[in-house]
Amino acid sequence: LPAAALAPGRRARQLNAAAALALLGTGVGLLAGDWGGGPRPGDATLTVYSANLEFERSDVSANIEEMLAAGCDVAVFQEVTPDYLRQLRAGLEGCYTEVVSTSRDDALGAAMFARVEVRNATIESAAGSPTPSADVVAGDGTVVRVLGVHTTPPIHGVGPWTAQHDRLAAMAREADRVVVAGDFNASGRHQPMRQLVAGGHLRDAHREVGQGLGLTWPARLPIARLDRVLFRGLEPLSLSVGCAAGSDHRPVTARFSTAGRRVSAVVEKVRERA
C-alpha cells in the first residue's frame, strides 16, 4: 500500500478499509478455488486437448467423444500408430483438420488436429522426439504457437530426456504466446521440468486453475502428473483431467483466454475499492 494510505485522515482510513476488504475478498476467493474465471467481453478462447494413446491399447473413439464434448479447438496426441491415425481421421472427419502427423509402430508417433485456422504447421525434432508445432489462430485473430510434447522417459537415458526438455524450452521462447501440451515424462520435482518452465518462461495451467492433484499416470491409480499443459501469454480459465480410455495415461484439457495475464486480483480489487 502507498505510504499516504497509512497517514491519519479520512481519505487514509477509506483506503485502508478498501484494501482490507479487497484482500479479504481475494483470500476467500482463492481458498474457494477462484483461480481462473471467465473471459471478458471481446476476449476469444482457445481450448487444447492432449492425450497419450499408449500404442495398441486405447479406445480412440472414447478420446474423440471426450474432445468433442469439451469443444476443443486443438488436439495433440502421443503414441499414434498407423491404426490410431486412421481412426482419428475417420472420427474427426468434417469437424477437424489433420494439421500434422507421424504415425509409428513405437511410442514416438504423434499427431495434431484442429478446427481453427492453422499456419506454419510442421513436426520438429526435440532432440529426437517428434514434436508437432503450429501457429493456431484464435477467434479474435490472436496467434498462439501450440507444441505437442512426448519426451522419452528417463529410464531410456537421462541425457536424451534432459536434452528434449532443453530443446522444448528453446522452442517455446520462439513465440510470444505459446501452449506446450503433452506427456513430459517428468513431474514438477524433476530438474528438466523445472528448467523447461524457467527457461521457456512458462506457467503450468494446473497450478493456476486445476482442481485436485491433477495426477495422470498410471491411469488406474495415478501417482504422478506427467501429462500437463504449459503456457505463456494467455490467461488460463480451466484445466481438467479426463478418462483414460484404455491408455496408461489420463488426458488433459486446458481452456485459455487470449487476453493474457491480467493485473493481480489483489491490486485490481484494491484499485476498485479505493
Regions found by a protein language model. Give the residues of each.
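Transmembrane alpha-helices and immediately adjacent membrane-cytoplasm interface residues
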Residues: 2-40
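Soluble catalytic domains of enzymes that build or remodel membrane lipids, polysaccharides, and related
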Residues: 44, 48, 54-68, 76-274
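Short acidic/polar active-site loop segments enriched in Thr and Asp
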Residues: 73
